[in-house]
Design a protein with these regions (language model features):
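Short beta-strand->loop
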Residues: 31-33, 124-126, 144-171, 185-189, ...
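N-terminal segment of the mature folded domain
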Residues: 24-153, 295, 302
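Extracellular/periplasmic juxtamembrane helices and adjacent flexible linkers that interface
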Residues: 253-333
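Short helix-loop capping/hinge motifs at secondary-structure junctions, enriched
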Residues: 127-133, 152, 165-173, 252-259
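Bacterial N-terminal signal peptides that target proteins for export
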Residues: 1-9
Length: 333
């Protein structure tokens, strides 16, 4: 009897020891854009716990943040990101064009691989001293604007395209008048930072400018961290549906053997837990149950999509942001 128990105990110890031996310590690198720092600081430990409970493997996720365009360039230049979570599809397309990501990447996850969305709003100082109410308020004489540089920042490109969409609607789809409106707006930009978080810091911490054109999530974060006694959010009548996108970096995950966990990391963003974390960090979730739960956090406004107004990112980039494009033309002083 005791001999049998001894054999059984030995077998259990051996099984436990083998599980310890087989458990892995995995590292992932998520190269992301500027304002997602807080989101992934909260999401990463939740995913790590989920993955360890599911597989026994421990995972450490490292983060890199910066302007979305600059981050894409860093991956193109050799930074070994397992996943990219960038501000817009064009930046991931740029990596795919160099062969590191499958060109059909956008079809691999739901909602065109955009697990959460945002839009573009205005952050103003308490009392709204310049009386900013909509896009046309931004071109009033004496209004100093802070927005990042579309050459380096994904959020800045969304800002620019949101302004252009308003210009079209306000001028009966007249593209020349829309161009004149956006030109007038950029003539009043005081600082063009390289990324969205830098622009927020310029406005919030350095006290420069009357209005910050910002991601909605970034504006809400500023309000909730610094207080409604310092800043207010102005939601314009119309803005763009901003869709930050995500992908595994195929070349890297196949080299490092991390495809399974990298894919699971992105898929978990669509889970109820992932969607809840997105909403808590002021991103608009996709899950309808979570949308309903947080409906009071996100004002209703008219939203247009990139495809409805600009065709696709390739067209928008070529016309507006490429060297010699419309942005270069209108930003000359």
């Amino acid at each position: 009897m005791f001999k049998q128990w001894g054999l059984l105990s030995a077998a259990l110890v051996a099984l436990l020891f083998s599980n310890i031996l087989w458990a892995k310590d995995i590292q992932l690198l998520n190269v992301s854009y500027d304002p997602t720092r807080e989101l992934y600081q909260q999401y990463n430990p939740v995913f790590s716990q989920y993955w360890e409970q599911k597989t026994g493997d421990k995972v450490t996720i490292r983060q890199s943040h910066g302007g979305s365009g600059k981050q894409a360039t860093s991956v193109i230049n050799g930074i070994e990101a397992d996943v990219v979570t960038l501000a817009l599809a064009y930046d991931i397309d740029a990596i795919a064009q160099r062969g590191s990501i499958d060109k059909q990447w956008i079809t691999r996850l739901p909602d065109n691989s955009a697990p959460y969305t945002s839009t573009i709003v205005f952050l103003v100082r308490k009392g709204n001293p310049k009386q900013i109410v909509d896009w046309d308020s931004l071109i009033k004489p004496g209004v100093s604007i802070i927005t990042p540089n579309p050459k380096t920042s994904g959020g800045a490109r969304w800002n620019y395209l949101a302004a252009w969409g308003y210009g079209l609607k306000a001028n009966h789809q007249d593209s020349e008048k829309a161009k004149a409106f956006v030109k007038a707006l950029y003539q009043q930009v005081e600082v063009l930072d390289s990324g969205a978080r830098g622009a927020t810091n310029t406005f919030v911490e350095r006290g420069i400018g009357d209005v910050l054109i910002a991601w909605e999530n970034e504006a809400l974060l500023a309000i909730n961290e610094l207080g409604t006694d310092k800043f207010e959010i102005v939601t314009p009548s119309i803005s763009i549906l901003a869709e930050p996108t995500v992908s595994v970096v195929d070349k890297v995950v196949d080299k490092r053997g991390t495809r399974e966990i990298a894919t699971a990391y992105l898929e978990y963003l669509y889970s109820p837990e992932g969607q809840e974390i997105a909403a808590k960090n002021y991103y608009r979730p996709r899950d309808k149950v979570i949308v309903e739960k947080y409906q009071d956090s996100f004002p209703k406004l008219e939203l247009f999509t990139l495809n409805e107004v600009f065709g696709d990112w390739q067209s928008a980039q070529k016309i507006h942001f490429a060297t010699g494009g419309v942005f270069d033309e209108i930003s000359r002083r």
